[in-house]
Amino acid sequence: MAFTKKTVRDADVEGKRVLMRVDFNVPLKDGVVTDDTRVRAAIPTIQYLKEHNAKIILMSHLGRPDGTGFQPELSLRPAAEKLAELTGFDVKFVEDTYGEKAKEAVDALQPGDILVLENVRFDKREKKNDPEIAKTLASYGDIFVLDAFGTAHRAQGSVVGPAAYLPAYAGFLLEKEVDTLTSIFADPERPFVAIVGGSKVSSKIGVLDHLIDSADTLIIGGGMAYTFFMAKGYTVGTSLKEEDWVERAGEMLKKAEAKGVKILLPVDNVVADHFGEDAKGEVVDSDKIPDDRMGMDIGPKTRELYAEAIKGAKTVFWNGPMGVFEMDQFAAGTEAVCRAVADSDCTSIIGGGDSVAAVNKFGLADKMSWISTGGGASMELVEGKALPGVEALLDA
């Protein structure tokens, strides 16, 4: 399915002020960027604009500020420094977003210059999509480019606002993300195996529903598996469960059966008596979880079962871990699935969020076909929802 919006290639950017929303929401430790994936992802569009002598104004959020003003630990300065380090470009930074200092910094730009504005969320009006915010941001540019796929599902001031006042185009990352994620579901090479993990059925109900309509096999892991176990009549001890969603999980199992879609649930689990770094794991079958134990990971038989299903796939979509992979003693299930996907001769799409963290943790990022930079945005696209940020752009 071809991308239906105009991209930066369609714009005349020569000498123009290009206001670009990027996703520099990167993890920081002691003021240093610990994972630069999102900064790297924005570079192709930035490079293109620089080569075409645009005056480039970059804006992003970082973290969850309280919206009452400057918070030094959530400043975008480290992201601006990382961009300079990765590209070798001179990157200017201004400790202001909507005020006089920002306006002066924009006015001083020459063709080819790059300026990063301070965190857009230091003002609470950003999240409310306040028109005043949008108007201020739009006043900095002649053209608006959206390349922040990770926030394209949010109707917020810096994401959709400028498009009301400026001609709005997609950046290369946004185009590639939407193209990749929509085409895989429109016409996947089969067998198509979807792997969904994570803690809650409730947060991924739309995705699961959509996958039952398009996948040949649906593999379920993580905390959500225990709600499905309850639908099958198993007891799950003190495992994470959503009792309000048991009936819905049961309906999904029936729907999959009626459609001839194979749903794979864990046959064994690694359980522990409490949730903590010092917790010790033991393996039990899925229908024999003791009352005082909680599921923390899929067990060894399940790891083999899932790896076998993945091995035969031509297309794999993966979103969500198989267990508490942040703790090494409960990481084996997620690692096994990750390695099976990496070793498989398939088109592999990693759907953002914790799956990306897992792929990076196990050093397998270069073995995947496409790693999405969006968690929530990927999921909404997979569900078939329109993304407000994309909708606001000019039609091709």
What name fits each language-model region?
Residues 1-396:
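Active-site loop-to-helix "anion-binding N-cap" substructures in soluble metabolic enzymes
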